[in-house]
C-alpha cells in the first residue's frame, strides 16, 4: 500500500486518537534531510515546531549567564519544541563575534558552542543564520563599511550583494563558521547533526534592485559556496516570502514596499533545500484593523504553502511569526488567534503529507533578560493561554510523526515478510 493513499485515513485517525500513542520516542539524532515536500530524520517525517532566540550566543558568551541558555532549552523541550533559530553573526561593534574580516572573538564563539551543546543535550535542532540584513549586530552595513575602509568604491548597503570584496568577506565568514570546532561537543559545526540548517541571511532585501536580479545572483553564488564546503546540512535563504517578477499575479499579496526578492525564483535555486516565509501583519499593516490583518495572514499562508507544495516542491517553514504586546489595543486573545491560525495552517497541511513542515514563533525569552523583550517575547515558564496553544501544536505534530512512523514500519515489515516467504524460483516457503 502506498503511503499517499493513507493520507485521508491518517487525518481521520488523528482526529479520533488520543494524544499519546504509546510508541517509543523517535530518535532525534542524525541529520535532517528533505524527502519530497517533507523533512526526514532517520527515515521518518520530521516537523519543526519551534522558536527564534537570536540572543543565544550573545548571552552565552558570558559564562555567568549560561544557566539562562540551559533554562531556555529545558523549557522548550518540556513543551515539545524541536527547532530553534538563532544568529551565528555579530559583526563589528560591541561584543562582536567578528571584530573585523576574519578576526574572531573566542568568547563569543564559545558562547555559540555552548548553545549548540545545550540544544544537543535537550534534543533540539538549530538553524544558524550567517548574516543580518539590518544594522543590528553589524549586518550588511558593517560588511560594506569594511570594504569601503579598504578602498572599495561602495556607496550603498545594497553593494553587499554585488561587490567582490564584500562577497569574499562573507564567504570567509561562512567558512569560519562551518569549520568551527565546538569546544564543548568536540565536533566541527559542519559535522554536527544538532544543526538542522544554515541560513544565508536574516531577511535579505535589496530595494535598489526591484527586478530581483541582484539577490537572485547572490543566492545562487552563495548557495553553491556553502554546498561546496558542507554537504551534510540543509540550506535556506532566509527569505520573508515577498513575491517578485516570476509570479506577477502574486505580487498583490505583498505588503507595500520594494524588496528586491522573488519568493518563487529565489527558492528554485539549486542548493536551496527548503522554503521560508515570515509574517508580521501588525508591523506591515499597522493602521489596518485586526480583522484585515488576519485576512492578510490567512491569504499569505495559504498562498505560500500552496506554492511550496505545487510550484517549488519543497518543504516550507514559517520561520518568523508573532504578535506584539506593544501595539495599541493588544490583548492576549489576539495573540492566541494569530498562533492558532498559523498552527492550523501548518497542521492542516502536515496531516495530509503536505509541504508545511513547521513554524518558529518570534521569540522565546527566559526570566532575567528583559533587555531583549521587543514586545513579541514569550516566557514558557509563565503560564499563559498562548503557551497552551504552543504545547498543543507540539502534541499534534508529534502524533502525526508517530503515525507516519508506524505506517512506514508496517510497510517495511510487509516487504520483509514477503521477501522471506518467497524462494529463488518464486515458490512460497512454508514456515
From Swiss-Prot:
It is an enzyme of class 3 (hydrolase). Keywords: Glycosidase, Hydrolase, Secreted, Signal. It comes from the Eukaryota. GO terms for molecular function: mannan endo-1,4-beta-mannosidase activity. Coiled coil: none annotated. This is Mannan endo-1,4-beta-mannosidase 7. Induction: By gibberellin in germinating seeds. Pfam families: Cellulase. GO terms for cellular component: cell periphery; extracellular region. Its EC number is 3.2.1.78.
Amino acid at each position: 500500500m502506498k503511503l499517499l493513499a493513507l493520507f485521508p485515513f491518517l487525518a481521520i485517525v488523528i482526529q479520533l486518537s488520543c494524544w499519546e500513542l504509546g510508541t517509543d520516542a523517535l530518535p532525534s539524532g542524525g541529520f535532517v534531510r528533505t524527502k519530497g515536500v517533507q523533512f526526514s530524520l532517520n527515515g521518518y517525517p520530521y516537523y519543526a515546531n519551534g522558536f527564534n532566540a537570536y540572543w543565544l550566543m550573545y548571552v552565552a558568551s558570558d559564562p555567568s549567564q549560561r544557566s539562562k541558555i540551559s533554562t531556555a532549552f529545558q523549557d522548550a523541550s518540556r513543551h515539545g519544541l524541536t527547532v530553534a533559530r538563532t544568529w551565528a553573526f555579530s559583526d563589528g561593534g560591541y561584543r562582536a563575534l567578528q571584530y573585523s574580516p576574519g578576526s574572531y572573538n573566542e568568547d563569543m564563539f564559545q558562547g555559540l558552542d555552548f548553545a549548540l551543546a545545550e540544544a544537543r543535550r535537550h534534543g533540539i535542532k538549530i538553524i544558524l543564520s550567517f548574516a543580518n540584513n539590518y544594522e543590528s549586530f553589524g549586518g550588511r552595513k558593517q560588511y560594506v563599511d569594511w570594504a569601503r575602509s579598504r578602498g572599495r568604491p561602495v556607496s550603498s548597503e545594497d553593494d553587499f550583494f554585488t561587490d567582490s570584496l564584500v562577497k569574499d568577506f562573507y564567504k570567509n565568514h561562512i567558512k569560519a563558521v562551518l569549520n568551527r570546532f565546538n569546544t564543548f561537543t568536540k565536533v566541527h559545526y559542519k559535522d554536527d547533526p544538532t544543526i538542522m540548517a544554515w541560513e544565508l541571511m536574516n531577511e535579505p532585501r535589496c530595494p535598489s534592485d526591484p527586478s530581483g536580479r541582484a539577490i537572485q545572483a547572490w543566492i545562487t553564488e552563495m548557495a553553491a559556496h556553502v554546498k561546496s564546503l558542507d554537504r551534510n546540512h540543509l540550506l535556506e535563504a532566509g527569505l520573508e516570502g515577498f513575491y517578485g517578477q516570476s509570479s506577477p499575479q502574486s505580487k498583490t499579496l505583498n505588503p507595500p514596499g520594494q524588496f528586491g526578492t522573488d519568493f518563487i525564483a529565489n527558492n528554485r535555486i539549486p542548493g536551496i533545500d527548503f522554503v521560508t516565509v515570515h509574517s508580521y501583519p501588525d508591523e506591515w499593516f499597522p493602521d489596518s484593523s485586526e480583522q484585515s490583518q488576519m485576512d492578510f495572514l490567512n491569504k499569505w499562508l495559504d498562498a505560500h504553502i500552496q506554492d511550496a507544495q505545487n510550484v517549488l516542491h519543497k518543504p516550507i517553514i514559517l520561520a518568523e511569526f508573532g504578535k506584539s504586546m506593544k501595539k495599541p489595543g493588544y490583548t492576549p486573545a489576539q495573540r492566541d488567534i494569530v498562533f492558532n491560525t498559523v498552527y492550523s495552517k501548518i497542521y492542516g497541511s502536515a496531516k495530509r503529507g503536505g509541504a508545511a513542515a513547521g513554524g518558529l514563533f518570534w521569540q522565546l525569552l527566559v526570566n532575567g533578560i528583559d533587555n531583549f523583550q521587543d514586545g513579541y517575547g514569550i516566557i514558557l515558564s509563565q503560564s499563559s493561554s498562548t503557551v497552551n496553544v504552543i504545547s498543543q501544536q507540539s502534541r499534534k505534530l508529534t502524533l502525526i510523526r508517530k503515525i507516519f512512523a508506524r505506517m512506514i514500519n508496517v510497510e517495511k515489515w510487509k516487504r520483509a515478510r514477503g521477501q522471506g516467504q518467497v524462494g529463488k524460483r518464486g515458490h512460497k516457503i512454508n514456515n
